């Protein structure tokens, strides 16, 4: 993992309380939705607080985060929040003061606030303080490759077997898969692999657009618009995830296996090269 100059030795400080009014529910502007190429951003801290001071609902978003960690919200963010089958970004937040925050998880609340969970290696940020966000570039690129690869597998299935309805997508490393109603078998792997390879070779553009109204929870922004991802105009999927600009940039997609359970078939895939073993 890239640490952006953050010391791996994290210093312990007394747990802090909120630096702003807890009733503040200002939605975070998620800039990655409009420009996924951003890797650093200067913004302003809205709150910095201990995890234990969050509501029970908000604490449930960070089940595997140590209780002694902290959470920071800011006016804007380039950090992708876990959801839509994709893990969150990680990285660091720094300032011109001796305060750095290492981000280990980002989650979005129902009211549109992005909670950046992690650890300080110095004194906490103050409300209104200017800070610089830096995301782990290699991890973002890998997650974007996996997510775009999932859409490519989905388009291949749509072109080959349009009668198969997609029921679930998972773009996590080592778990990436697409699930469909009905039965598929390992004998179908070569056909799916061939179509996937063809779509990668065509180097089709990944097109992002916004439509008014609600086409499903995935891809919806807090203002009610829906973000649509399309591969060369051949498909249109509500999607809030990050993507590479073109299919040719995913690397090689490997259809690993096809499995079945209770009438649902899972097409497991990976991309190569990746950064996470």
Predicted regions and their residues:
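Active-/binding-site microenvironments in catalytic and ligand-binding cores
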Residues: 5, 10-277
């Amino acid at each position: 993992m890239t640490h952006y100059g953050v010391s791996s030795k994290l210093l312990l400080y007394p747990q802090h309380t909120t630096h702003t009014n807890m009733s503040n529910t200002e939605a975070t502007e998620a800039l990655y939705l409009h420009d996924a190429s951003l890797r650093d951003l200067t913004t302003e801290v809205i709150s910095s607080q201990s995890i234990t001071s969050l509501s029970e609902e908000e604490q449930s978003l960070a089940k595997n985060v140590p209780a002694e960690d902290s959470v920071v919200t800011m006016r804007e963010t380039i950090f992708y929040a876990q959801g839509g089958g994709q893990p969150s970004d990680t990285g660091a937040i720094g300032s011109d003061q001796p305060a750095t925050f290492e981000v280990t998880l980002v989650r979005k609340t129902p009211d549109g606030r992005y909670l950046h969970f992690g650890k300080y290696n110095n004194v906490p940020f103050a409300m209104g303080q200017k800070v610089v966000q830096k995301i782990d570039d290699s991890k973002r690129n890998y997650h974007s490759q996996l997510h775009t690869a999932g859409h490519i597998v989905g388009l291949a299935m749509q072109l080959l077997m349009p009668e198969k309805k997609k029921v679930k997508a998972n773009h996590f490393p080592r778990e990436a898969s697409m699930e469909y109603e009905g039965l598929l078998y390992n004998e179908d792997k070569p056909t799916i692999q061939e179509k996937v390879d063809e779509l990668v070779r065509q180097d089709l553009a990944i097109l992002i657009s916004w439509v008014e109204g609600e086409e499903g929870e995935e891809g919806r922004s807090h203002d009610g618009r829906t973000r649509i991802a399309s591969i060369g105009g051949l498909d249109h999927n509500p999607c809030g995830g990050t993507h590479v600009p073109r299919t040719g940039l995913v690397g090689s997609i490997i259809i690993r296996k096809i499995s079945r359970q209770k009438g649902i078939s899972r097409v497991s895939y990976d991309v190569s090269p990746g950064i996470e073993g």
